[in-house]
Amino acid sequence: PDVHMELDEEYDILYSSGTTGIPKGIIHSHLARNLLISGTQSMAFDEAVVLTSTPLYSNTTITTWWPSVWMGATQVIMRKFNAEGANALIAEYGVTHAMLVPVQYQRMWAAGNHRPENWRSVQWLLSTSAPLSTEMKKKILRDTQAQLLEFYGLTEGGVATTLVARKAAELGKLASVGQVQAGGELRILGEGGELLGPNEAGEIVGRTGIMSDGYLNREEATKAMHWFDEDGRLFYRSGDVGYLDEDGWLFLSDRIKDMILSGGQNIYATDLEHALNALSDVIESAVVAKPSEQWGETPWAFVVRRAGCDKIEDEIRLEANETLSPIQAIAGVTFMDELPRSDIGKILKRQLRDNFTVTA
């Protein structure tokens, strides 16, 4: 049929992960998807064997799914992810490309059948949806010869950075989420909306060539995401706190909604999580604000212990607090078998907050 589509016409509607509230339908144009495909030309998808293990409806998956379909790559699709199965498929099919979220990398490296030699075929590894820890990046670079790319951004577009891990490691920037993608711009805003300078933390806003058309039937939510510079150009608000260093590398601090206001002081939950995750008996953790009549909010940690650990909650809490300032001190710990996650692997902190009853 004779069908003509304009580049600015709607192409798809993807839903946000809903980690902080009700998922929102995000509208993307044909131009946005064309730019996604053209931006991966250097990754040789025409000869690729691509492992697909995340939900097909997510923007995370589309990053490798669409280029591989467009260029005729081989797809190795998992109906449901499990770490040992993914490791086995990489070895069996000689996987060359994979988009994995941080928790998948963690579980695959911890699995009993993880062997670095089985990853020799892998040329490109990608990560997004949540920050990939510096320690995990180091393990990937040590155990594979692959190019590791970490993407930070929004399904909505606007804010987008890329970390080329081997280059970042050489420059001592591995803890960052990279530099702004070609054609993009980033700004850091203070609490009053003022522009901040290098190494000053504030809300990250950005603009790119790939920007959604807003939220489906959510006009107010769309407007709330907008920020305009002095020239009237549209930027998107990320809802994340971070800073740009003097070389333009972006470092994340926390989600604005995840910051804890205790006794008038802002506490970054990620700082506390890093302290907990560095403990030998902790697999992973999530820290949220617990209501407190005395302080307003206090930090409370949900922790997954390593097998065989017999320490009680207070021992873990005190051990972590030894590395934190008194202002950051964790008030309590709850052990869990696993943390609640979305289908794409993001920790659902709103579910953790639902555990609380207001106490002094």
Residue positions per predicted region:
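Conserved adenylation A10 loop of the ANL superfamily
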Residues: 13-25
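Active-site glycine-centered loops adjacent to acidic/histidine catalytic or metal-binding residues
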Residues: 129, 153, 178, 240, ...
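AMP-binding/adenylate-forming catalytic core of the ANL superfamily
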Residues: 90, 98-101, 208, 213-214, ...
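Conserved structural elements of the adenylate-forming
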Residues: 7, 12, 26-47, 53, ...
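Gly/Ser/Thr-rich phosphate-binding loop
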Residues: 70, 95-100, 109-172, 185, ...
